[in-house]
């Protein structure tokens, strides 16, 4: 048995302590974990510095922001755990009841998933978010961090397990796979005897590898090739504010805009205003400017590189924006449906017909009208921190909160009935 299998077995053995814990026990554990996380701030920051030093020069500036921890972010992680503790316990919820003609009473009841595996890349906050959500939803959790964030993840998990040790929940219900080699990921993908669900969080390569190789049931948290279409009837003040926020607030996250579509009737006047906002104003403010990848029509109005064959199919996660002009809302929808990963896509318009057409025909987990796509987030949706953004349709879609991490069973109460 490999070390990874041993850790999977420990989580499976400990799952009953979580599966059967009541609301008070789970909340007590989460609050202890949050306190312990804050108490370990110095250790976590020291570990994070190791990760940052190892990554220096090897990852883009925008990705460094994902990896970076400071005291404020650790406090936010702890507060995120406390927010999960404050959410209703999904386990035990009665979903449906019915009584059959023969007198059998059937209850459909929400239950814990069991053991959830998470494979993720260089985002230390995922460690605490995933642990909190899994435990509150009644499941043990096995985490497999990317190598870039491993020292941070190890320090975070050590703190969380210290908190768990003060409660009735077995600390073994939280595991961080120590082996950062690729084989440990494949062991988790094949671990159907230990894992009830596997969730990948990361770039397209990781997600594709898990979806194509896993024998464990998977919820796909897809990449975010996120589009915003500026209609000819858009309010320009709204449009500029939305585009600025959707692209620049955190370009390294999956709900950040990657492709801007602009109606050709307004492109000649709108795009230069956008260029001023995203390039010259940011340079004057000492901020990284947005670098444009332009189709031939957009290139007539602003400066930038010519868009390559793959630029409208790329999740840049950087200060790069692909820009294209379109002749109608119908063409915008066609382009999005051709290139979208069905994560989050939006329209800016004051035309109700255009908005209705867009929301009807765009098949994404979140579809926006006159708002930034950056809101696709469990916290912003009122779900607490989320396990990821599901882009598939089965079991879960969009931000995955507590309910999306559970299953259900039927309880059938009889009085001696037998089937004829």
UniProtKB/Swiss-Prot annotation:
For this chain, the family text in UniProt reads: Belongs to the gamma-glutamyl phosphate reductase family.
| EC primary class | oxidoreductase
Q: What Gene Ontology cellular component terms go with this record?
A: cytoplasm
Q: Which residues form a coiled coil?
A: none
Q: Its function? A: Catalyzes the NADPH-dependent reduction of L-glutamate 5-phosphate into L-glutamate 5-semialdehyde and phosphate. The product spontaneously undergoes cyclization to form 1-pyrroline-5-carboxylate.
What are the GO BP annotations of this UniProt entry?
L-proline biosynthetic process
- Highest taxon listed in the record's lineage: Bacteria
Is the keyword GTP-binding assigned to this protein? no
Pfam families cross-referenced by the UniProt entry:
Aldedh (PF00171)
Q: What is its EC number?
A: 1.2.1.41
**What is the annotated localization of this protein?**
Cytoplasm
Kindly tell me the pathway this chain contributes to. Amino-acid biosynthesis; L-proline biosynthesis; L-glutamate 5-semialdehyde from L-glutamate: step 2/2
Tell me the protein's name.
Answer: Gamma-glutamyl phosphate reductase
What Gene Ontology molecular function terms does this protein carry? glutamate-5-semialdehyde dehydrogenase activity; NADP binding
Q: Which UniProt keywords apply?
A: Amino-acid biosynthesis, Cytoplasm, NADP, Oxidoreductase, Proline biosynthesis
The reply to whether Ribosomal protein figures as a keyword in the UniProt entry is no
Which reaction does this enzyme catalyse, per its entry?
L-glutamate 5-semialdehyde + phosphate + NADP(+) = L-glutamyl 5-phosphate + NADPH + H(+)
